[in-house]
């Protein structure tokens, strides 16, 4: 097992917690201070890259996952695909809808032009909460023919059950709260 202690220390030390945001009763983990600290960002990217060193493509989830995914792809020498929220890409696109607490959302990637068929993909995002977004991302890249070899996040909120929802995929979270 890889030692992620430097990344865990940086995340624990630098994360800013905001109570009652974006709504009452929610405690929001703002990882912006982790990303803005050069050493913090470096050790987090290094730890995420260690999760799947042989991956061919990073699937970076809109929007904070873009910051991490680009760094991880650069570290590994792999490609990166931006998994976008609906309506941000020109057609044709592949899409995957998923359920939110109050409605649905859709994620998209370009159809056909990014060559995912048969390639190994690591899905990267900042936070795992309920797992809806990450599950939809994994299903989306699989629909393009990719093999999801793992999911890696900086912070996991265990009480929200996302790990169980993602049970079929190898999952690494640097910090669990």
Curated annotation (Swiss-Prot):
InterPro entries in the cross-refs: Ade_phspho_trans, PRibTrfase_dom, PRTase-like, UPRTase/APRTase
Biological source species: Rhodococcus opacus (strain B4)
Protein origin, superkingdom: Bacteria
SUPFAM superfamilies, sorted: PRTase-like (SSF53271)
Catalytic activity line of the entry: AMP + diphosphate = 5-phospho-alpha-D-ribose 1-diphosphate + adenine
Coiled-coil annotated residue ranges, if any: none
Pathway field: Purine metabolism; AMP biosynthesis via salvage pathway; AMP from adenine: step 1/1
Quaternary structure (record): Homodimer.
Protein known as: Adenine phosphoribosyltransferase
UniProt function note: Catalyzes a salvage reaction resulting in the formation of AMP, that is energically less costly than de novo synthesis.
GO CC terms, sorted: cytoplasm
PANTHER family per record: ADENINE PHOSPHORIBOSYLTRANSFERASE
Gene from which the chain derives: apt
Keyword terms of this UniProt record: Cytoplasm, Glycosyltransferase, Purine salvage, Transferase
GO terms for MF: adenine binding; adenine phosphoribosyltransferase activity; AMP binding
């Amino acid at each position: 097992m890889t030692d992620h202690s430097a990344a865990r220390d940086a995340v624990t030390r630098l994360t800013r917690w905001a109570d009652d945001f974006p709504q009452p009763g929610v405690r929001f983990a703002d990882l912006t201070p982790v990303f803005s600290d050069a050493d913090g960002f470096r050790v987090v990217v290094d730890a995420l890259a260690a999760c799947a060193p042989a991956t061919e493509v990073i699937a970076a989830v809109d929007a904070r996952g873009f910051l991490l995914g680009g760094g991880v792809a650069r570290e590994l020498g792999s490609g990166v695909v931006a998994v976008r929220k609906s309506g941000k890409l020109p057609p044709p696109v592949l899409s995957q809808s998923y359920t939110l607490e109050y409605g649905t959302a859709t994620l998209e990637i370009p159809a056909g032009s990014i060559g995912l068929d048969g390639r190994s993909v690591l899905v990267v995002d900042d936070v795992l909460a309920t797992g809806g977004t990450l599950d939809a991302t994994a299903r989306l890249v699989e629909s393009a023919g990719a093999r999801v070899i793992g999911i890696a996040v900086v912070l996991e909120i265990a009480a929200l059950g996302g790990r169980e929802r993602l049970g079929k995929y190898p999952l690494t979270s640097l910090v669990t709260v």
